[in-house]
Amino acid sequence: MAFRFAVDCLGFENKPSEAIEAVLKYWSFHQDLNFILIGDEKAFDGLDILPKNITKKLANSFIEMTDTPLSARRKVNSSMQIAINLVREGNADVVISAGSSAVYASLTNDAFGKINKNTKSAFMSYVPTDNNNWFYFLDVGANKYFTGKELYFLGLMADIFVKKTTTKKTPKIGLLNIGTEENKGFDYHQEAFKLLKADKNLNFLGFVESRFLLDGICDILIADGYSGNLVLKAMEGTFKTIARILKRGYKRNPLAGLFSLGIIKSVAKKFDYKNNAGAVVMGLNKLALKTHGSADKQQFLSTIRLAHLSLKSDLINAIKTSLNNYEE
């Protein structure tokens, strides 16, 4: 099937060319796909000749990082709103943006609606671990507050995603908390714990502490968006700090760097968040993906790749069908 991607090329920290170049590169390996680039005249300057499967759509404004959901709704011709509308109206299958997270979560929720009355939208990212694996982590910033039942439904949706997109038939689910004891956390942790534990269709491990995340003990980690975002950014910052420390050390001792360069490059590539960028917006009736506000070409590529995987697995319909059993 010729999937159609709507890509918002404005409203993030880098130049629009980072998004455009990522699209061109990914399309060069997947020429059956269609891409719609949404930007302004300046973004498309010099981009006169494009492959027939890649088209441009002009916007007269963009969502700034200082915009609120309320102010963003007034920008009806912003690049983000146009991209979202393409999916809402059936003219694209997925929307991708690096714009404001709060605005994107709000506008996609308005346009697409909940996939189930019990769901709340959540950004689901993926994080590499030290056992040559990774885990899917949600919510990492779409919504600060969740009820226990809403966290439970995050687990249900992520479980479906992993089963559809990987070979894992019984993915291990963990619930982020400050300790592993069953009495830890707030009331919503307790409620979510009971629901997850009672569901015999889920492989629920229990509470998981953040210090064990990179050990690869779970395939799915559930958290409210506030906690999830803090943990994700702390990990990204830690990886960058370690890289700087190693770089300074090798400058002082080049010989040590020479002998360990291969290992260091392998580890750096694995844990570089640019290679693991992109978050699926779970809980909606249509497919949307979010990438970093500082996204570069590599991060857009990672996000497009994840979007393509989600489309090929027919993710939205799979979640809808499965959650029909949870209408109570």
Curated annotation (Swiss-Prot):
Keywords: Cytoplasm, Lipid biosynthesis, Lipid metabolism, Phospholipid biosynthesis, Phospholipid metabolism, Transferase. Its EC number is 2.3.1.274. Its main location: cytoplasm. It comes from the Bacteria. Pathway: Lipid metabolism; phospholipid metabolism. GO terms for biological process: fatty acid biosynthetic process; phospholipid biosynthetic process. InterPro entries: FA_synthesis (IPR003664), Phospholipid_synth_PlsX-like (IPR012281). It is found in: Cytoplasm. GO terms for cellular component: cytoplasm. It is an enzyme of class 2 (transferase). GO terms for molecular function: phosphate:acyl-[acyl carrier protein] acyltransferase activity. It catalyses: a fatty acyl-[ACP] + phosphate = an acyl phosphate + holo-[ACP]. HAMAP family: PlsX. Belongs to the PlsX family. Homodimer. Probably interacts with PlsY. Catalyzes the reversible formation of acyl-phosphate (acyl-PO(4)) from acyl-[acyl-carrier-protein] (acyl-ACP). This enzyme utilizes acyl-ACP as fatty acyl donor, but not acyl-CoA. This is Phosphate acyltransferase. It comes from Mycoplasma genitalium (strain ATCC 33530 / DSM 19775 / NCTC 10195 / G37).
